[in-house]
Amino acid sequence: MDTNNGNAGKAFKLSVATLAIMNITAVVSLRGLPAEAIYGPSSAFYYLFAAIVFLIPTAMVAAELAAMFSDKQGGVFRWVGEAFGARTGFLAIWLQWIESTIWYPTVLTFGAVSLAYIGMDGASDAALASNKVFTLITVLAIYWIATFIAMKGLSWVGKISKWGGMIGTIIPAGLLIILGIVYILSGGHNYMDMSQGFFPDLTKLDNIVLASSIFLFYAGMEMMGVHVMDVNNPSRNYPKAIIIGSLATVAIFVLGTFALGFIIPAKDINLTQSLLIGFDNYFRYFHLSWAGPVIAVALMFGVLASVLTWVAGPSKGIFTVGKAGYLPPFFQKTNSHGVQRNILLVQGGIVTLLSLLFVVMPSVQSFYQILSQLTILLYLIMYMLMFAAAIVLRYKMKDTPRPFRLGKGNGLMWFLGAVGFGGSLLAFVLSFIPPGQIQTGSNAVWYSVLIIGCVVMVVIPYIIYAMRKPSWKDPSADIAPFHWEKGTEQQK
């Protein structure tokens, strides 16, 4: 946006409240609430801890980087590449894309459960939600429908995403919290063990593995950094919007988690079904059983909108970078709508293969958890690269204008970067430990999938980078050279 275009530019400035709401809608999702409801009151500690050491540092650091390179495409590829070279920059954008690809089956599993609960018989719905074949077919059907819609272009994506976010996330979140509050005030039995207290037992590592998944709850906040220059007085108003949005996000997560804990005993919580079961229990208590299928449809629509947004997002990012010579011509093909057709098809193939893990995992729940952990691991690697790059660029590009700067000196950047990097590293290590609360099958399968998955997904972009050829570069590519490159010659 041209901010120098007189009143026209000012008309498009975002208010603090608007940006805060955008932050909330970009991050909030309900599907992960059951994983934290297991922890009872201590879940609030995990949400707050992750917000302090991850959510806020991510939003603030990404804001400086986004403003610094607002006139250049590439996102994390640009940020990391300027600090550590094109090879590592390609690794960062690759991880952002591949983790979202691996994430699809997990969020779609939740979508399949929502579809199962459209019926009126709770027992039959639960049995259907646990059926591997039903879940597999539903996951693939929803994903390929989302891909087909994405192929039609951004106009379709925008319409469905806009309404899906409101109908499938914001309204159900508010309803869940209201139901929980009214339930307790009306004398309903509280199944949450309040004696556990706010602080968890941090000496038991296997008890905090699920808590590391909270970092994935907050993932994606770096994408909001592109709006840093869309507010008046960004040095004052952007941090204010981030703080307000972060506090509201934490409040929604905490209250939503407590609402589930109030109505479902911890021992009965299921990662994939408990959100729907919680709604059903509340509706029965208030004699509103007819509303169960309605909320299931709404959540299902929200899943479709969420997947559609991500199908069209990270794949577009790696497509743009690929045209600059980092991907073979096959991956640069588009359809008549200008959509990255071949990347979407390859992405769909990966999702289909991953979904077949249903047949080797002991349950839908274990499949959901292990893929969630792999997604977290890959995304955290990207975040560690981003935090490290932000600090390094304070020295490599110290004279480059920063429209939004964290502090006058380097102290605040060091603090936020170190806190974010340290928090990401801690969550990365914890994510390898099998959770004690969930049956994930053989530990050998758990470690094999996570370790081999991480190694393979990190090595692949290095292989692609080593094999690149001059003929891969599209003359129409709009990726500016890095500051350390001479002219437009890429690093060899």
Protein language model annotation of sequence segments:
Residues 1-63, 69-73, 194-195, 417, ...:
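Membrane-interface "cap" regions at the ends of multi-pass membrane proteins
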Residues 1-13, 387-415, 434-492:
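Terminal cytosolic tails of multi-pass membrane transporters
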Residues 3, 134-186, 219, 242-247, ...:
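Membrane-interface loop-to-helix entry segments
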Residues 8-18, 101, 133-140, 232-236, ...:
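Loop-to-transmembrane helix boundary motifs in multi-pass membrane proteins
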Residues 78-79, 85, 117-122, 243-308, ...:
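TM-loop-TM module centered on a large, flexible mid-protein loop between adjacent transmembrane helices
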Residues 113-118, 150, 167-198, 257-266, ...:
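Hydrophobic alpha-helical segments and their helix-loop junctions in multi-pass secondary transporters
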